[in-house]
Design a protein with these regions (language model features):
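Active-site catalytic motif of lipid deacylating hydrolases and related acyltransferases
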Residues: 22-33, 44-119, 167, 177, ...
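C-terminal catalytic-base region of ester-bond hydrolases, centering on the histidine
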Residues: 203-337
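Extracellular/periplasmic catalytic domains that process cell-envelope and extracellular macromolecules
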Residues: 48-52, 79-80, 114-116, 123, ...
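Bacterial N-terminal signal peptides that target proteins for export
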Residues: 1-7
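Serine-dependent carboxylesterase/thioesterase catalytic core
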Residues: 56, 60, 99-199
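C-terminal motif of bacterial Sec signal peptides marking the signal peptidase cleavage site
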Residues: 14-17
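Active-site-proximal beta-strand/loop segments in catalytic clefts of secreted hydrolases
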Residues: 59-62, 83, 88-93, 125-127, ...
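Short aromatic-enriched loop/helix-cap "lid" or pocket-rim segments at secondary-structure transitions
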Residues: 70, 158-165, 219-224, 252-253
Length: 337
């Protein structure tokens, strides 16, 4: 059966209250406003063949897209370890309204769950850690499709270095405008407030938050890290891991935590291969701090260069990403008010 047909049938069953998620009425959830063809085109998956492991959805950060960020690191390494892997690319390199970008995550999770018949392990970096939480908060069908969520350097409570929180950024925003997503990164934004109101970790999902002292973009890290969820509450389904608590001499910044850091990868791998969130000792403990290559056996896949070259005409045809310049934070969608 063709995957699209399989997805359509599974979605129909799900909407009718049948299938693996009994009781979830998709029709009662916030309606996805994005063109379904765009949502479909944004998702790329390997065949769903490894039934003993959860399929993994990789979610990129701001200024990049799924293939650029993951096709040379996490994706081949996870495939090598027997995982089915998907990447999703939300619009305009993450510059637009994150409420819109979250619809791409909702659709991806529903589709992967329906086509694979398994719950999904999601790994996201930066905005790709923050924004999918919006999908999990407001769409029960998205929550029901996920068993693990690994968040790498996610500004979960906003960041002190948001462009709108400094005089120059505020001036530029009020005159020329700033990308919509930039306003939503601020600690006092309506987006952050709505996201963290009530349960920060909804659903039967294990959450692993990994962050670093040397993150120049997601601040503060101490005394209470903005990347952490339910910090200090001892929730058994949540692990908040500061890399320097594991490896005191490890220097990892905002970019490398989501691209090349070995300890981060091993902790993420531990989370998605065991029940519960990541466990530092089980993942290797002090051994994660030894002189190791940035990622285990990392090497550019032979076809990586050709894949990137194949993207060029598509990028040229699509033109420059929309900047989504606005002079104020986008209003909250009605379902979040």
């Amino acid at each position: 059966m063709k995957p699209r047909l399989l997805f359509a049938l599974a979605a129909a069953l799900l909407a009718g209250g049948c299938g693996s998620d009994v009781g979830i009425d998709v029709a009662s959830e916030p309606k996805l406003e994005t063109d379904p063809a765009l949502l479909d085109a944004a998702l790329e998956c390997t065949p769903f063949a490894n039934t003993d492991k959860p399929p993994v959805l990789l979610v990129h950060g701001t200024f990049t897209h799924g293939q650029e960020q993951f096709n040379w690191n996490y994706k081949p390494l996870l495939i090598e370890r027997g995982f089915d892997v998907c990447t999703v690319t939300y619009p305009d390199r993450g510059l637009g309204d994150q409420q819109v970008s979250a619809e791409y995550i909702v659709h991806a999770l529903r589709r992967i769950h329906a086509e694979s018949g398994r719950k999904v392990a999601m790994i996201g970096h930066s905005q790709g850690a923050l924004m999918p939480r919006w999908a999990l908060k407001w769409w029960p069908s998205a929550r029901a499709a996920v068993e693990d969520f690994v968040l790498l350097a996610g500004p979960n409570h906003g960041t002190l270095v948001a462009a709108t929180d400094n005089p120059l950024g505020a001036m530029v925003g009020s005159t020329l405008g700033l990308p919509a997503a930039f306003y939503q990164f601020a600690r006092g934004s309506s987006f952050i407030g709505a996201l963290n109101a009530g349960d920060e970790t909804p659903g039967d999902v294990d959450y692993t938050n990994i962050y670093t002292l040397f993150d120049e973009l997601v601040q503060p890290v101490v005394p209470e890290p903005t990347a952490a969820l339910e910090f200090g509450e001892d929730n058994p389904k949540v692990a908040n891991i500061l890399l320097q608590d594991v490896c005191p001499l490890l220097i990892v910044d905002h970019l490398t935590i989501g691209l090349t850091d070995r300890a981060t990868f091993e902790l993420a791998l531990d989370a998605i291969t065991h029940v519960g969130p990541a466990n530092v000792e089980r993942a290797g403990g002090a051994a994660l701090c030894h002189a190791l290559p940035p990622l285990p056996g990392i090497a550019l896949p032979p076809n990586f260069l050709f894949e990137m070259l194949a993207l060029l005409p598509i990028e040229i045809e699509n033109g420059a990403p929309g900047l989504h310049l606005v002079r104020a934070e986008p209003p909250l969608k009605p379902y979040a008010q």
